[in-house]
Swiss-Prot record:
GO MF, one annotated term: calcium ion binding
PANTHER family in the record: TRANSLATIONALLY CONTROLLED TUMOR PROTEIN-RELATED (PTHR11991), TRANSLATIONALLY-CONTROLLED TUMOR PROTEIN (PTHR11991:SF0)
Function of the molecule: Involved in protein synthesis. Involved in microtubule stabilization.
PROSITE patterns per UniProt: TCTP_1 (PS01002), TCTP_2 (PS01003), TCTP_3 (PS51797)
Signal peptide: none
Principal location class: cytoplasm
Organism lineage string: Eukaryota, Fungi, Dikarya, Ascomycota, Saccharomycotina
InterPro entries listed in its UniProt record: Mss4-like_sf (IPR011057), Mss4/transl-control_tumour (IPR011323), TCTP (IPR034737), Translation_control_tumour_CS (IPR018103), Translational_control_tumour_p (IPR018105)
Swiss-Prot/TrEMBL keywords: Cytoplasm, Cytoskeleton, Microtubule, Protein biosynthesis
Domain named TCTP: residues: 1-167
Protein name, as recorded: Translationally-controlled tumor protein homolog
Length: 167
């Protein structure tokens, strides 16, 4: 299994357990799902209509996004202006890291990042933003949106802003 960790904070952001697609040469998108967590209701596959006393009562469960929950991502908020301020600083920091490690990737990163940021800004109200567990303000912000069907959530992380750790 490969864990994708933030190059600045070391926070775990995603793993290859999710179906990951590369977009614009700079983004990894992974579909995720809303899942129930908590409570002590264990589904053993029995038909609930044949069981007595099976009421739909609050049992301490909550519905969460599986990626957000699994990697303990923390919600954060932006308006367009603050997002643009953040993303400019973040892109500059990633570019500096690339200069050290992989200067040949800089043109691809700059071009692809510009295209993807325009997509995000174009549909800004539809996006949700999360930080890693450490909530490091200089680290990557994980972006979450929904596919065209309106029900399938996906997360987006910057390919050049992660280290891959094989475990």
């Amino acid at each position: 299994m490969i864990i994708y960790k933030d190059i600045f904070s070391g926070d775990e952001l995603l793993s290859d357990a999710y179906d990951i697609n590369e977009v614009d040469g700079v983004i990894y998108e992974a579909d995720c799902a809303m899942v129930k967590v908590g409570g002590d209701n264990i589904d053993i596959g029995a038909n609930p209509s044949t069981e007595d006393g099976e009421d739909d009562v609050e049992d301490g469960t909550e519905v969460v996004n599986n990626v957000v929950h699994s990697f303990r991502l923390q919600p954060t908020g932006f308006d367009k202006k603050s997002f643009l301020t953040y993303i400019k600083g973040y892109m500059k920091a990633v570019k500096a890291k690339l200069q050290e490690k992989n200067p040949d990737a800089i043109p691809t990163f700059e071009k692809g990042a510009q295209v993807y940021v325009k997509k995000v800004i174009g549909s800004f109200k539809d996006w949700e933003f999360f930080t890693g567990e450490s909530m490091d303000p200089d680290a990557m912000v994980v972006m979450l949106n929904y596919r065209e069907d309106g029900t399938t959530p996906f997360v987006a992380i910057w390919k050049h802003g992660i280290d891959e750790e094989k475990i």
